[in-house]
């Protein structure tokens, strides 16, 4: 995501996708207890390592204990097995997990998280290799052919099905 902080160290292509705002995935039977962001104080909240979702946790859930893992599927498994209390995810990904796993839900407090940032391709600051014009041209072509929309829809659907888990330790 092209955030102001990331713009300080890299240049970015034209946006190719803007997700719905980030959401907090929790166990369905606990969802009602997370009405506000303050309800996460003292709780373990997962986020994918080296992503803007880590920043969401540290900035907007300052009383939470951040748990960073490389893979979203690992974070969701940690949630299912009770090793974390919640996971902050891209909105569409969180929705897919909640829709495909009845043991999971979106925390009501998610509405307080704010807006999503556009997804772009990062290049070295100053674009010393001159890549941005070709990248932007490719993005424009894929957008005009609806290829990006098709890819993103398929990827979001797959993200919720990548690991279909249940709390009784069985994997489907």
What are these regions (language model features)?
Residues 18-26, 53, 95, 99-172:
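Periplasmic-binding protein-like
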Residues 1-9, 56-59, 85-115:
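A ligand-binding cleft/hinge motif common to bilobed small-molecule-binding domains
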Residues 32-33, 67-81, 92:
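Short helix-initiation/N-cap motifs at beta->coil->alpha
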Residues 37-50:
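Short loop->beta-strand "edge-of-pocket" segments that line small-molecule binding or catalytic clefts
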Residues 40, 79-80, 121, 135:
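Hydrophobic residues within well-ordered alpha-helices
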Residues 1-39:
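Acidic, polar ligand-binding/catalytic clefts
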Residues 17, 53-71, 98-102:
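Ligand-binding cleft/hinge of the Venus flytrap
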């Amino acid at each position: 995501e092209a955030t102001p902080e990331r713009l300080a160290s890299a240049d970015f292509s034209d946006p190719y996708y803007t997700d719905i705002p980030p959401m907090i995935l929790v166990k369905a039977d606990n969802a009602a207890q997370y009405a506000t962001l303050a309800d996460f104080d003292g709780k373990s909240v997962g986020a994918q390592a080296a992503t803007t979702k880590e920043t969401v946790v540290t900035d907007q859930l300052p009383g939470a204990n951040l748990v960073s893992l490389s893979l979203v599927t690992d974070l969701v498994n940690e949630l299912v097995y009770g090793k974390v209390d919640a996971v902050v995810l891209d909105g569409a990904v969180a929705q897919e997990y909640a829709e495909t796993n009845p043991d999971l839900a979106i925390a009501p407090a998610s509405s307080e998280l704010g807006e999503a940032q556009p997804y772009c391709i990062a290049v070295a600051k100053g674009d010393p290799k001159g890549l941005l014009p070709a990248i932007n041209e490719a993005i424009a072509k894929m957008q005009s052919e609806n290829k990006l929309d098709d890819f993103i829809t398929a990827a979001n659907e797959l993200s919720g099905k990548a690991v279909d888990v249940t709390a009784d330790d069985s994997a489907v």
